[in-house]
Amino acid sequence: MFDIGVNLTSSQFAKDRDDVVARAFDAGVNGLLITGTNLRESQQAQKLARQYSSCWSTAGVHPHDSSQWQAATEEAIIELAAQPEVVAIGECGLDFNRNFSTPEEQERAFVAQLRIAAELNMPVFMHCRDAHERFMTLLEPWLDKLPGAVLHCFTGTREEMQACVARGIYIGITGWVCDERRGLELRELLPLIPAEKLLIETDAPYLLPRDLTPKPSSRRNEPAHLPHILQRIAHWRGEDAAWLAATTDANVKTLFGIAF
């Protein structure tokens, strides 16, 4: 099983990053996609992906950091995307929940990254919070120019999920679905996601599954917990976990064009 969303550049992993990666593979994870959320972290993610086997990375600017976007950023992302470890542009998108960057700054950076991905024929790794309508409006003109797209850490509604799937967008599901307080709506729509459009992820070190036992004392999530998330998703979808692992792995290979 492949974790499509690991924030391995996080300072929370600074002291034991090697052990975190080793634990993931010991637990049965067979590949990691390391998320780049700004230029500096995208550069770090690429270096980590080169350092560890069966790891790849994304290169892009998260909506929270969109105020940093400038011409030099674009040039650096394009240069970074030429590295073999980098297999997607992102994390890019819109987040109108907290607006750490203004909506205008977010939209400018998002469209710029969609254009880069289209020009480089690379898939996009996307983020959307409380911005679905505007997100889809900006994305729609680019979808037929992109080889693929995933909306990572999906937490939206049934209608939003169906709108994405209808346009060929992959849906990334995290341990959010294991949260009995805020993940119930997501849990109910799990069976409606076509298996061929489903991807799984931890978003580590964030989103530690609330039903994980025993819970780590650090309360830190890590990719070794992906098997737990997979098992819970398979249970709620009424599918065999091994089959779902193989299916989501095949989806990773199709979307990102990688072998593992």
Swiss-Prot record:
Superkingdom classification of source: Bacteria
Cofactor(s) for this UniProt protein: Mg(2+)
Presence of keyword Cytoplasm: yes
Residues binding a divalent metal cation, per UniProt: E91, H127, H152
Function noted in UniProt: 3'-5' exonuclease that prefers single-stranded DNA and RNA. May play a role in the H(2)O(2)-induced DNA damage repair.
SUPFAM superfamilies: Metallo-dependent hydrolases
Keyword Cell inner membrane: no
Keywords per UniProt: Cytoplasm, Exonuclease, Hydrolase, Magnesium, Metal-binding, Nuclease
Protein name: 3'-5' ssDNA/RNA exonuclease TatD
One Gene Ontology term of the molecular function aspect: 3'-5'-RNA exonuclease activity
Catalytic activity, EC: 3.1.11.-, 3.1.13.-
Subcellular location(s) per record: Cytoplasm
Pfam families xref list: TatD_DNase
